[in-house]
Amino acid sequence: MTEHGLMSELDLLVSEGRNPRTMDIDLLPTIDVLRKINDEDRLVPVAVEKVLPEIAAAVDRIVLAFQKGARLIYVGAGTSGRLGVLDASECPPTFGVPEDMVIGLIAGGPDALVRSTEGAEDDPKMGAQALQEIGLTPDDVVMGIAVSGRTPYVIGGLNYAKQVGATTVALSCNPASTIAGIADIAISPVVGPEVLTGSTRLKSGTAQKLVLNMLTTASMIRIGKSFQNLMVDLNPSNKKLVARATRMVMQTTGCTAQQAKQALHQTSNDVKLAILVTITGLDVEAARAALGKAGGFLRKAISDPTA
């Protein structure tokens, strides 16, 4: 695309527009600059609320993929790609899932996480190649993340995913974007022009983070990774998380700290099993079997441990 063509295309994007409410921001004292930013940030959850039905549709497809042993794969560039990698990296410690269950792919590879590699996003073939290298299957879900909705790396990834037969989801902050037209499900929270024109790490990035939080959290809840509102499948890999695991056993069973620690020791720090053993009196192997029959849903295993 020529420079003139690119400029014309950017002129049409909401996310590249100039914000009339911040035209004088360079003249303001610090506290008023912050108020302007804060006022604009208030618009983000409102925009996300408007696309909850589309987010729910994506969650349902992700749950189906997880139930088949398949994956959720984020594809993005720049800030969008980093947010995908961040969300993916939080899933194993939070929900005790394998590292390859949720994957974040970013244009430019790992180096792009710590330094700008803006040119890496311009080749659609690289998006397709990244998915080829991880062995994309028809059972996987691929989410393309791009504020503009026109990033070539993301477009290439989504087009390849469509060829493979995987479910495709687009997350952009512009209505009727290119990637929205490609994907099976389009999530487009329109947050309006940024405080600083085109700085989409601001409101747009915040909107993306909120949506990604919802997608993985709701999907993990739907496959039994929580009990009540507790992260009972977390991996207690440091002192803080060990303390959190102990508290969860205490909170759900009413036992003492010593009893909770003993139950966690018996179950090799498996919070779900520790809770089930404490509540039902089952031995560890019987509790493990009951949890398996319940499909990993702790509430179901507690209500009928002999099912």
UniProtKB/Swiss-Prot annotation:
Example GO biological process: 1,6-anhydro-N-acetyl-beta-muramic acid catabolic process
Keywords, in A-Z order: Carbohydrate metabolism, Lyase
Active site: 90 (proton donor), 121
Enzymatic class: lyase
Enzyme nomenclature, EC number: 4.2.1.126
Domain SIS: 62-225
Keyword Lyase appears in the UniProt entry: yes
Pathway, per record: Amino-sugar metabolism; 1,6-anhydro-N-acetylmuramate degradation; Amino-sugar metabolism; N-acetylmuramate degradation; Cell wall biogenesis; peptidoglycan recycling
CDD domains linked: SIS_Etherase (cd05007)
Note: A lyase-type mechanism (elimination/hydration) is suggested for the cleavage of the lactyl ether bond of MurNAc 6-phosphate, with the formation of an alpha,beta-unsaturated aldehyde intermediate with (E)-stereochemistry, followed by the syn addition of water to give product.
Family: Belongs to the GCKR-like family. MurNAc-6-P etherase subfamily.
Identification of the protein by name: N-acetylmuramic acid 6-phosphate etherase
Organism name: Mesorhizobium japonicum (strain LMG 29417 / CECT 9101 / MAFF 303099)
